[in-house]
Amino acid sequence: MFGSDLYIALILGVLLSLIFAEKTGIVPAGLVVPGYLGLVFNQPVFILLVLLVSLLTYVIVKYGLSKFMILYGRRKFAAMLITGIVLKIAFDFLYPIVPFEIAEFRGIGIIVPGLIANTIQKQGLTITFGSTLLLSGATFAIMFVYYLI
């Protein structure tokens, strides 16, 4: 489900995210994240890995890096993105020794874990994960119906 499907899912995810944010005031981990995760929503191991790396990114920046650096605003956002990228690269190095489901993690947008982690620090874990999974599921469902037609 890539190529033009990726573009359709991203546009759909952005539109759903905008509508959701306008109606509820809750931002689902960046506008592009539900589109990316909607593409792989039928692979629970993959979704769990993305959420795990996002949580790990948040914990490393909040309780690790922020003890040694002054992080706020753009600096904190950059630290979240860079930490997420470094963790994803670490997963890429583990590729030969991990199961196939984890190897598929290599295909996800490299900034997705950082975007989710940044939203966790703003809105909290439950709200971020809940809204992101809700909109990713909605994106997946709409794409599924699109394929049936």
UniProtKB/Swiss-Prot annotation:
> Which gene name belongs to this protein?
capC
Q: Write out the transmembrane intervals.
A: none
Q: Which organism's genome codes for this protein?
A: Bacillus subtilis (strain 168)
Coiled-coil region? none
Q: After gene disruption, what is the outcome?
A: Cells fail to secrete PGA into the medium.
Q: What does this protein do?
A: Required for PGA (gamma-polyglutamic acid) biosynthesis.
Q: Name one GO cellular component term.
A: membrane
**High-level lineage:** Bacteria, Bacillati, Bacillota, Bacilli, Bacillales
Protein name per its UniProtKB record: PGA biosynthesis protein CapC
User: What does the record list as GO biological process?
Assistant: capsule polysaccharide biosynthetic process
